[in-house]
Swiss-Prot record:
Any single GO CC term annotated in Swiss-Prot or TrEMBL for this entry: extracellular space
Taxonomic path: Eukaryota, Metazoa, Ecdysozoa, Arthropoda, Hexapoda
InterPro entries for the chain: Haemolymph_juvenile_hormone-bd, To_sf
Leader sequence residues: 1-25
Listed GO biological process terms: circadian rhythm; positive regulation of circadian sleep/wake cycle, wakefulness
Family membership: Belongs to the TO family.
Protein species of origin: Drosophila yakuba
UniProt protein name: Circadian clock-controlled protein daywake
Gene3D superfamilies per record: Haemolymph juvenile hormone binding protein
Keywords assigned: Biological rhythms, Signal
Amino acid sequence: MQLTSASVCLLWMGLLSWVSHRIDASQGFPSPLKRCKLQEESCLVAQAQTFFQAFQKGIPERQVAALEPIDLGTMRIESGGHSESLKFKLVMSDAKLYNLANSVVVKSLKGFTKDLTKPLKLTLLMDTPELEVRAKYDVDGKLLILPIVSKGDLTIRMNEVQTKRRITAEPVKRSDGHSYLNITDYKTITKIKGGHFDLSNLFDDNKELRESTLKVLNQEWNTLALDVQPKINEACSKAFRAILQSLWANIPYDEFFKAE
């Protein structure tokens, strides 16, 4: 069968498209991220910072979710007996974390190694001047002798947040001969200087009663944080684990770094 010039052109276009698809499948880190040398922590920190700034809307073609805001899903919180005056059951739905990607300062990123015989233990440290969680809330509880049963919008502002993320990732060899990182554990630990709660529709928005109740709740920030903060950390861990796993899914670990 003799190929016409048009057929040859179409054949080449098909081959180029196939090659392009094969390259895209393992093209490494998306621009503007760059590879670093393994032990060059300053470069690793800079690339982590770039990731937060450059991909606030996520990377849809790689199934990487948005970083601003970050979807935290639903959190269920029950007071743990830290205060006799405050008892509650709180459901936060459609929760989202704001202000991280556009204000975070990455301080340290350590733990990468050439040894693929055991899991990697990564530690990421970062600071954020203010984070904000917004959600729909449903609360059933009491403050002193005052019942609090309400639904509405909730905002939690957290100031001067120091975060440590501990990530365990296992190298898994695939049929292509390359090893890829599979995250097996992700923990978030935070230290917060202070915070503030705001809830709409308390007591049918009776202004005087609402404001006096919020004043007492915010005076009890440290007590409330003992119950609320771990649940936010847990939700953040789940969200970031999915984001990072999607980023790493098709990047062979041997393509993470420049040659030494």
